[in-house]
Amino acid sequence: MKLAVIGGDGIGPEVTDEALKVLRALRADIETTDLDLGARRYLRNGELLTDEDLALLREHDAILLGAIGAPGSVPPGVLERGLLLKLRFALDHHVNLRPSKLYEGVESPLKNPGEIDFVVVREGTEGAYTGNGGAIRVGTPHETANETSVNTRYGAERVIRYAFELAQSRRRHLTLVHKTNVLVHGGGLWQRTVDEVAREYPEVTVDYNHIDAATIYLVTDPSRFDVIVTDNLFGDILTDEAGAISGGIGLAASGNIDATGTNPSMFEPVHGSAPDIMGKGIADPTAAILSAAMMLRHLGDEANAVRIEEAVARDVAGRDPEAPISTTEVGDRIAAAVVA
């Protein structure tokens, strides 16, 4: 298994090291290539993501990312557009996959959360994030700006099909989230596509929520959800809310996936680079380790993905919430548990 590793910035390299520790406990065939991408490189030489970097990434089976960002050192949007979004579009990561699970021993901010175990399938290469827009008369009283949301049948359908396949392997329930009563063109395309694809999956029940209703249900009744499929912007909102109700983004993993397998998919913890705790050895690597499990599942190694997830569940359940986290100790415990 050839892995490209982007440790990135802040605590990124620390948590990625622990994810690799767990992977190597299970697999002896892992070959890694470290790539220097992120704020440190940008501040050093102004480079973000070159054609050579992309060519090297394409030689690998998957990409493991730590964290990107240097708040206060790099202007907002530079790393997001020049590195992260460029990676997503260049490698056609059209599926953003975000599981949300409340583990035993983890406190939710919800008073009575019930069972939280669902997945958000977010379209990753279209919608409002394509950069299709502009502004005129900037800085004047007549300034006008627009951001065009681009939705194609091709782009929506491939993500919707991925979501149906996922739902079929889980509890067989899919929820489309959009705003079809106002966004009648883009929303209509999504609704029609879901309705048509649903005929091929008669075992999967389907319902629909407006985005505003979905944000309410995530707080009042999260157990109603199994697989949520939605567009880029709404998915961005829902996935952060989903992380918050299930114990925080410190436990949240994600995948940026080319479902065709043409390009390597990328897996990462949701949390940021947290430069304030960099080098202190107190960053929680759990999300990075769960990202590694997602990667194994994507590559067809279901058995080892389950081993990691079960080891994480036991480890989280046994933690003292008042005790400080040790990055390497968490990695050591989970690496030992997956082979016990």
UniProtKB/Swiss-Prot annotation:
Catalyzes the oxidation of 3-carboxy-2-hydroxy-4-methylpentanoate (3-isopropylmalate) to 3-carboxy-4-methyl-2-oxopentanoate. The product decarboxylates to 4-methyl-2 oxopentanoate. Its cofactor is Mg(2+); Mn(2+). GO terms for molecular function: 3-isopropylmalate dehydrogenase activity; magnesium ion binding; NAD binding. Substrate binds at residues 88, 98, 122, 212. Its EC number is 1.1.1.85. InterPro entries: ICDH/IPMDH, IsoCit/isopropylmalate_DH_CS, IsoPropMal-DH-like_dom, LeuB_actb. It catalyses: (2R,3S)-3-isopropylmalate + NAD(+) = 4-methyl-2-oxopentanoate + CO2 + NADH. Pathway: Amino-acid biosynthesis; L-leucine biosynthesis; L-leucine from 3-methyl-2-oxobutanoate: step 3/4. This is 3-isopropylmalate dehydrogenase. It is found in: Cytoplasm. Belongs to the isocitrate and isopropylmalate dehydrogenases family. LeuB type 2 subfamily. Mg(2+) binds at residues 212, 236, 240. The keyword Oxidoreductase applies. Its main location: cytoplasm. Keywords: Amino-acid biosynthesis, Branched-chain amino acid biosynthesis, Cytoplasm, Leucine biosynthesis, Magnesium, Manganese, Metal-binding, NAD, Oxidoreductase. One of its GO terms (biological process) is L-leucine biosynthetic process. Homodimer. The record marks 129, 179 as: Important for catalysis. HAMAP family: LeuB_type2 (MF_01035). It comes from Corynebacterium efficiens (strain DSM 44549 / YS-314 / AJ 12310 / JCM 11189 / NBRC 100395). SUPFAM superfamilies: Isocitrate/Isopropylmalate dehydrogenase-like (SSF53659). GO terms for cellular component: cytoplasm. Pfam families: Iso_dh. Binds 1 Mg(2+) or Mn(2+) ion per subunit. NAD(+) binds at residues 272-284.
